[in-house]
Amino acid sequence: MTATRTEALTDAGQKTVFKILAAISVCHLLNDMLTSLLPSIYPLLKSSFHLDFAEVGLITLTYQSTASLLQPLVGLQADRRPRPYSLAVGMGFTLFGLLMLSMARTFATILVAAAFVGTGSSVFHPESSRVARMASGGQHGLAQSLFQVGGNAGLSLGPLLAAFIVLPRGLSSIAWFSVAALLAMIILANVGSWAKRHRLNRTKSHATNAEQHATLPVKKVALSIAVLMALLFSKFFYLASLTSYYTFYLMSKFHVSVRSAQIHLFVFLGAVALGTIVGGPVGDRIGRKYVIWYSILGVLPFTLLLPYANLFWTGILSVVIGVILASAFPAIVVYGQELIPGRVGMISGLFFGFAFGTAGVGAALLGELADLTDINFVYLVCSFLPAVGLLAAFLPNLERAGLHTAQESPV
């Protein structure tokens, strides 16, 4: 297969636009902070609506399914006809879903609200990931890390806000967070204006800078994508056990309060944010394959220890697991973008969507497993998932193959 190598040529004369990266990261923080309110209030929803674990998992499945199924389609369409202003529209879906959730009186309403929130994420992630790459100035791993760390920071804030605002004041207090959604829409409208101007400038330079560059054979690319998807499955299925059921695990095994469990979840998600910061720049420096290999397989000893640890060591191990495991995702996304030049939106949508979908299916299946057995058994089973990291041995070394400069046509 061949691809147009242009970005490597034009990036050499461009600087990293940290102002845009910061704006996208802040909006990612706000988006994921708002969406993470949903799993953070599961204890409240479970008690208020008399739900079992399977129904809790169904809420997550509804949210993650709408996000995962739509994201690759949104990303592919964005590659063909970029619509930077769709970022603000996507945030509008999230806003509507939150307002619906704050007024929910039935389980069906909760599911519909979760679907709207998921749709907002499906629009936000592919296009914003494209914009982050546009502003990278060639430092793609760094840009992806800065973009993703905003999301991880938002995910860590969600449980904290739920613990200190929503849980004491009730479900209706979620409506207060509409202010954050409106702020994000304003910022994203300005980011969309910049992206439109940037794309026009790059299109003008494309005609003089384009040249052809051979990449990996189609079969090799397909195998590599399949391996990356398997690694994402391992990573996000395991993360689903923590993001959806970690609070229940702590309350069941160690008899801590809901607020204490939420704080533990906040610490874990903070560790995930730290790992995300590290993964991209390290991948730029030493190669993304090595980051992927270590971050998935290297976490295995710690996940195996977690089910047998006391409360103190559970907190420590969760931090170590969060840092190591999270470092993989920026490297995986950029690695995939380099495998298939010209399809930044599609790859971003595919990987983000698959991640959300895996988390949703994982949450539902683990909820069923917890109902059939107990929550402790769930973590015992999940502790072996990082062994899938052995598949990273089948990934080609793009840097050694000279493929790391193969990039997409102007975005």
Regions found by a protein language model. Name each.
Residues 36, 64-72, 155-156, 269-277, ...:
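Residue-level signature of mid-helix packing/kink "hotspots" within the transmembrane helices
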Residues 38-39, 222-269, 273:
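Extracytoplasmic gate region of multi-pass secondary transporters
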Residues 50, 82, 103-108, 137, ...:
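Helix-breaking motifs and short loop linkers at transmembrane-helix boundaries and internal kinks
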Residues 69-107:
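Conserved MFS/SLC helix-loop-helix module at the cytosolic interface between two early adjacent transmembrane helices
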Residues 70-82, 276-287, 370-371:
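Helix-to-loop junctions at the C-terminal end of transmembrane segments
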Residues 113-150:
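Cytoplasmic helix-loop-helix junction between adjacent transmembrane helices
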Residues 147-197:
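Helix-loop-helix hairpin linking two adjacent transmembrane segments in secondary transporters
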Residues 283-332:
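C-terminal transmembrane helical hairpin of 12-TM major facilitator-type secondary transporters
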